[in-house]
Amino acid sequence: MLELREFIREDMDNIDLGYEMLQEHKDAFKAPYAIHGYTLLEDGEIVAMGGVHMLWNKVGEAWIMLGKSAKSKPRTVAKYADLMFDVIVHKNKLNRIQASIAVNDAKAIRFGKWLGFEMEGLMRRYGPDGSDYYRVARVQ
């Protein structure tokens, strides 16, 4: 059975992404920033988590991390993600949430569009490996 709860920083250490995330990236989510997020669990295992880092008044940076088990339930995870962003935007009275999506990640680009994010531009050499990313945003 699926359970949705508020994101806690320790979730970063407990999600099985199917790849190793750099510690400095994990630490960014553990810092005392204003993070509003949720974690989706199934039988105690983290399926996905996501949320918004508050940048300044009415603006935030959206993020999602999918565990290995999310691949077996893409529609369910997508519906939870859409609901999660709606709740966070409403609860925090946000005008804008933005995100970064790797240019070579076609699935993430499609998912972002499905979530209502619109393409705003190309961020050259933005990624940790120097790769290009798109800036996308959902503006109310």
Predicted regions and their residues:
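A conserved beta-turn-beta hairpin within the catalytic core of GNAT-like acetyltransferases
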Residues: M54-I64, S72, L94-N95, D132
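Conserved beta-strand in the GNAT
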Residues: T39, E45-M54, G60-W63
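Short, small/polar residue-rich loop motifs at catalytic or cofactor-binding pockets
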Residues: P32-A34
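Conserved acetyl-CoA-binding loop-helix of GNAT-fold acetyltransferases
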Residues: K73-I88, R110, W114
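A structural microfeature
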Residues: A48, G121-R124
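Conserved beta-strand-loop-alpha-helix junction that forms the acyl-donor binding cleft
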Residues: L94-K113, E118, Y126-G127
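Short amphipathic alpha-helix that is part of the acyltransferase structural core
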Residues: M1-K26
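C-terminal "cap" of GNAT-fold acetyltransferases
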Residues: A62, R125-Q140
